Amino acid sequence: MNSIEFPLLDQTVQNSVFSTTLNDLSNWSRLSSLWPLLYGTSCCFIEFASLIGSRFDFDRYGLVPRSSPRQADLILTAGTVTMKMAPSLVRLYEQMPEPKYVIAMGACTITGGMFSTDSYSTVRGVDKLIPVDVYLPGCPPKPEAVIDAITKLRKKISREIYEDRIRSQQANRCFTTNHKFHVGRSMNTGNYDQGFLYQPPSTSEIPTETFLK
């Protein structure tokens, strides 16, 4: 088509047609439609709840909290994760459809926090269970920091290639529900070594002079 013969038509086409890739179009469509699954276990989640109010208004980012992992594409872990909760967290993550993302919020989620030194039941970092996209340190992080983490995640989504992401997740999985948990022998059987228990002497063994004094 000759642009000299049809100047108005050529101008209209230039203003209404754009070329892109299917991958970029998919990333652009997901930027403002993140549906988070809120996994809060302690005080960090209270800071995230502040985003619901009118002061921060996280609806402008397209965040729609979901209660089902099958409808969510973002899981936000906030708080301490224990060994007993680890299989449930992994199951929730595996039930989310692809592509899916993870934000680790707070020191307890990232490293175990103050419980990492003397607690045998605390997971030292949620990235040992599921792959993390954005780390959000703090104890607890402020709502402004949560918004900054969501902004960084949106930038990451806009630049990613879907095939590379799937390949990296399959190679870097640290924990799956297919692992076999060995059930150890219970210690709370009631059969304790009597030698370690304090047994007060019976009254018949105490001399009578002790009572007369």
Swiss-Prot record:
Bound cofactor: record note: Binds 1 [4Fe-4S] cluster.
Residues that, per the record, bind [4Fe-4S] cluster: C43, C44, C108, C139
Gene Ontology CC entries for this record: chloroplast thylakoid membrane; respiratory chain complex I
The EC number(s) this enzyme carries: 7.1.1.-
GO biological process: aerobic respiration; electron transport coupled proton transport; photosynthesis, light reaction
The reaction(s) this protein catalyses: a plastoquinone + NADH + (n+1) H(+)(in) = a plastoquinol + NAD(+) + n H(+)(out); a plastoquinone + NADPH + (n+1) H(+)(in) = a plastoquinol + NADP(+) + n H(+)(out)
Keyword 4Fe-4S: yes
InterPro entries named in the record: NADH_UbQ_OxRdtase-like_20kDa, NADH_UQ_OxRdtase_20Kd_su
Cofactor: [4Fe-4S] cluster
Compartments reported by the entry: Plastid, Chloroplast thylakoid membrane
Main location per the UniProt record: plastid
Sections of the chain in a coiled coil: none
Record-level Gene Ontology MF annotations: 4 iron, 4 sulfur cluster binding; iron ion binding; NADH dehydrogenase (ubiquinone) activity; quinone binding
Topology relative to the membrane: Peripheral membrane protein
Alphabetical keyword list: 4Fe-4S, Chloroplast, Iron, Iron-sulfur, Membrane, Metal-binding, NAD, NADP, Plastid, Plastoquinone, Quinone, Thylakoid, Translocase, Transport
Protein role: NDH shuttles electrons from NAD(P)H:plastoquinone, via FMN and iron-sulfur (Fe-S) centers, to quinones in the photosynthetic chain and possibly in a chloroplast respiratory chain. The immediate electron acceptor for the enzyme in this species is believed to be plastoquinone. Couples the redox reaction to proton translocation, and thus conserves the redox energy in a proton gradient.
Sequence similarity: Belongs to the complex I 20 kDa subunit family.
Subunit structure: NDH is composed of at least 16 different subunits, 5 of which are encoded in the nucleus.
Protein name per its UniProtKB record: NAD(P)H-quinone oxidoreductase subunit K, chloroplastic
